[in-house]
């Protein structure tokens, strides 16, 4: 008997979970932990509560975090990449590790922990770094989007920080309200904006969701090869570097990140420049999904002939 689409999605998710758990490495912390990048010694990540930072107002903070069962060290690497682009006297760059709690068979359980617990812990640890930060940029993939959304809500209540959320293919479990992601109360003295980079894979619309409180951009068509739920966390760091990292699975592939003259990804952040951020604030949220596409190659009826001769 042929399998129904819902059954295929369930099987695909289960196989992903089994594979990821089997090959997971780099032991996570026993409890969710915030790390920040430090220059000395040895250019490394240190637990935020062990860093000798003065508790100060006016800091800019950017934090990346993962989603359900992820082996890749992309949040840590992204924090280092951004740190290399900004003034370290003005920015704190780091990543939030809750992998121990994300290593569960059901992604719904990971999203539940992210929403109910991890977000609060992330907010608490950020506010230990700065009582009243100037600007907060939180970046997350999949289930982790619930953690940064909840953290942002707490930070918005307790500070006057400008808040930027970057959702990488947010996962919204069946029955959950997608409109609660990034639903930050609007106040005259606060600035909030979010971008959401989404795609589809073999699970169909499991993560393909337009968010009401984010600027929605479909990057599926610019994926090198098959569309992949994990592609956004390979793509976004590449927009920081201007190319895919030499150690990335997409190393050497062409990077696309424009819609017309507008650049997406890292270019939409304050880290990329004040003018970039101010331009982002003019982009609508809850928009019809914008689709990035590879530029069409000019038609060359004899191109195949010369290509064959060169081979």
Placement of each model-derived feature along the sequence:
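Bacterial N-terminal signal peptides that target proteins for export
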Residues: 2-11
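A domain-start/cap signature at the N-terminus of enzymes
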Residues: 25-52
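Proline/glycine-enriched tight loop/beta-turn segments at coil->beta junctions
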Residues: 54-60
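Bacterial N-terminal signal peptides
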Residues: 11-20
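Serine-dependent carboxylesterase/thioesterase catalytic core
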Residues: 60-68, 72-81, 89-98, 103-224, ...
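Short, aromatic- and cysteine-enriched interfacial helices/patches
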Residues: 3, 301-309
């Amino acid at each position: 008997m042929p399998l129904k689409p819902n059954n295929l999605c369930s099987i695909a998710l289960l196989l992903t979970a089994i594979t990821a758990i089997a090959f997971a490495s780099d032991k996570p912390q026993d409890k969710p932990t915030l790390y920040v990048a430090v220059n000395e010694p040895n250019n490394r990540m240190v637990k935020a509560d062990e860093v000798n930072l003065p508790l100060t107002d006016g800091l800019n903070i950017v934090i990346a975090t993962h989603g359900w069962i992820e082996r890749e060290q992309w949040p840590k690497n992204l924090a280092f990449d951004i740190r290399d682009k900004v003034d370290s006297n003005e920015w704190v760059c780091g990543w939030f590790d809750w992998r121990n709690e994300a290593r569960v068979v059901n992604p719904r359980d990971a999203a539940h922990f992210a929403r109910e617990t991890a977000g609060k812990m992330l907010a608490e640890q950020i506010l230990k770094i700065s009582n009243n930060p100037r600007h907060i940029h939180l970046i997350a993939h999949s289930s982790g989007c619930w953690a940064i959304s909840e953290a942002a809500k707490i930070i918005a209540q307790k500070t006057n920080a400008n808040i930027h959320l970057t959702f990488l293919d947010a996962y919204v479990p069946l029955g959950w309200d997608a409109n609660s992601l990034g639903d930050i109360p609007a106040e005259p003295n606060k600035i909030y904006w979010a971008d959401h980079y989404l795609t589809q894979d073999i699970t169909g619309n499991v993560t393909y969701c337009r968010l009401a409180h984010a600027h929605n951009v479909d990057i599926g068509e610019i994926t090198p090869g098959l569309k992949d739920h994990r592609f956004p966390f390979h793509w976004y760091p590449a927009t920081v570097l201007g190319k895919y990292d030499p150690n990335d699975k997409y190393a050497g592939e062409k990077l696309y990140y424009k819609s017309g003259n507008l650049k997406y990804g890292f270019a939409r952040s304050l880290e990329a420049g004040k003018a970039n951020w101010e331009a982002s604030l003019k982009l609508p949220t809850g928009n019809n999904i914008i689709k990035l596409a590879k530029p069409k190659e000019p038609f060359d009826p004899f191109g195949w002939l010369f290509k064959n001769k060169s081979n």
